Swiss-Prot record:
Residues 38-49 have a biased composition (Pro residues). The keyword Calcium does not apply. It comes from the Eukaryota. Keywords: Ubl conjugation pathway. PROSITE patterns: BTB. This is BTB/POZ domain-containing protein At5g60050. Residues 18-30 have a biased composition (Low complexity). May act as a substrate-specific adapter of an E3 ubiquitin-protein ligase complex (CUL3-RBX1-BTB) which mediates the ubiquitination and subsequent proteasomal degradation of target proteins. InterPro entries: BTB/POZ_dom, BTB/POZ_dom_prot.
């Protein structure tokens, strides 16, 4: 092999055995990949303590060893769990037979993990593996591949396991931003395009803390991804666009149970069964309930809610009509809808409902015609959606997030005082305010400005009867003014290099 080619492969992190020879008698062809990253700058020295440094006690040495060993044990335990699920077929449902590649991943601490994987999966999902393994392909020959000096062995193993997933976006729901960035880096390094796109879509949809915000921007700049894939993400923090058969039967039973609860005549029994059914749904969160079943019930609840409000608008001025009964009818229908939203969030199927709720112009119009004391329960649905988005449990695109606030935010402001006073036990005010704040901060800077300037005027007029999203206001202010002022003199432009 030419020395230039060897040098190129070393730079790419793929080092082949010089004695590599594909023949019927040779069963294994070891390939070694090195993923060592440049050494980090040394940490700042601790405060000087001559006696401690020169004569550490036995207790000091044991404490240091314990502090180093505990994180390693936790990481090794998580890796073992991932591998157990992988081997037991929990992570993937493919019938590929025994693996034809032995993949060994070695951490910087020397910990080694070996997995039996499939050339077909590696080659189809990773262009890096495809190029390197196809160039050495010979019938009847298995491979041994080693990835050494891994900064985070757990992430490398999990990324390989994710190649077997049929729904990456769903798999990533609930993961924190730092974990997603780690998966993104490894996916980009091995040209796992589906993994890269799923991580980017996740980052665009979930909120970031201020610390995470800087980490996200830095990471995307370092990875040199194509412009189109990161532009939408970076618009959140920059006003300038970046350049850069049994199942069916079970489903029927589930549908009947939900319908029974929604139509229950006894309120006490209804409340008890709501708690029980939701508890069972939460315990079996991975059970793939038919989306059509859940959304069929959601549409039924929405229709009932619209009809209920239509009737109330014609009857609320009727002196012979019991106003308490009117309020009870609306509260019941709204509570049914809210319960269904909770189930959709738990089943990770709520994205479509957010679009549906944003499109309820007729319902929002009827809502505005009814006194607040009757209608305020409906705004709990909007509040719950914001909490779900704010916690990263509902992933929808930016247009949908803005649309749902555009349709329902004024109603939530109007109803918040009644929600706070009459639902003090069931309404977690801080949770709602945090969820609303985080939802607002996932929008573009211009959208954040439009919403928060209106909120500012409303809050000064209503005080405690308006959700307090001061935290969102502070973050927006720093993004829009302080951050822009600090970067304006140099007129920075994110540079993306295509490889």
């Amino acid at each position: 092999m030419a020395s230039r080619e060897v040098s190129t492969m070393i730079k790419q992190g793929f080092i082949a055995d010089p004695s590599l020879s594909f023949s019927p008698s040779r069963i294994s062809s070891p390939i070694k990949l090195s993923t060592a990253s440049p050494p980090l700058p040394p940490p700042p020295p601790p405060p000087p303590n001559e006696s401690t440094l020169s004569n550490p006690t036995l207790f000091d040495m044991m404490s240091d060893e314990h502090n180093r060993e505990l994180p390693r044990r936790k990481s090794h335990a998580r890796v073992a769990q991932i591998l157990t699920e992988f081997k037991n077929g929990v992570v993937y449902g493919h019938s590929l037979g025994p693996g034809d590649v032995k993949l060994t991943v070695v951490g910087k601490d020397g910990y080694r993990v070996t997995m039996d994987v499939h050339r077909k999966v590696l080659s189809e999902k990773s262009r890096f593996f495809m190029e390197k393994m196809n160039s050495r392909r010979e019938k009847g020959v298995s491979h041994m591949v080693e990835i050494s000096e891994c900064d985070d062995l757990e992430i490398y193993v999990e990324t390989v396991v994710l190649m077997y997933s049929d729904d990456l976006k769903k798999k990533l729901i609930g993961e924190n931003v730092i974990k997603i960035l780690a998966l993104l880096k490894v996916s980009a390094a091995i040209s796992f395009d589906e993994g890269v796109m799923s991580c980017l879509e996740h980052l665009e949809a979930v909120p970031w803390s201020e610390d995470e915000e800087e980490t996200v921007v830095t990471c995307l700049e370092e990875l040199h991804l194509p412009d189109d894939s990161v532009t939408l993400i970076l618009q959140r923090v920059s006003s300038q666009p970046s350049t850069s058969s049994t199942r069916t039967r079970t489903d029927d039973i589930f549908s009947k149970l939900l319908t029974g609860v929604l139509q229950a005549k006894d309120d006490k029994a209804r409340r008890e069964m709501k708690v029980l059914i939701f508890k069972l749904v939460r315990e079996e969160a991975d059970y793939d309930v038919s989306r059509d079943t859940l959304y069929g019930l959601c549409h039924r609840c929405l229709t009932s809610l619209v009809l209920c409000l239509s009737e109330v608008t014609t009857q609320m001025n009727d002196p012979g009509k019991d106003r308490g009964a009117l309020m009870g009818e609306i509260a019941r229908e709204a509570d049914n809808m809210l319960w269904m939203v909770d189930i959709l969030i738990e089943k990770k199927l709520c994205s479509e409902f957010v679009k549906l709720w944003a499109d309820q112009k007729e319902l929002a119009n009827l809502h505005s015609k009814i006194p607040t004391m009757y209608r305020h329960e409906i705004s709990k649905i909007t509040a719950q959606i914001c909490v779900g988005i704010g916690k990263g449990r509902i992933l929808v695109n930016r247009e949908t997030r803005f649309a749902v606030l555009n349709t329902w935010l004024e109603a939530l402001y109007d109803d918040f005082g009644w929600m706070r006073r009459l639902s003090s036990r069931s309404l977690d005010r801080k949770l709602v305010e945090d969820g609303l704040s985080q939802t607002i901060l996932t929008l573009s800077l211009r959208q954040q400005q439009v919403i928060l300037m209106k909120w500012f005027d409303r809050f000064l007029s209503k005080g405690d009867d308006c959700p307090n999203v001061q935290r969102a206001f502070e973050v927006w202010w720093r993004r829009a003014f302080i951050r822009q002022v600090l970067t304006e003199p140099d007129e920075p432009r994110l540079q993306i290099t295509l490889y």
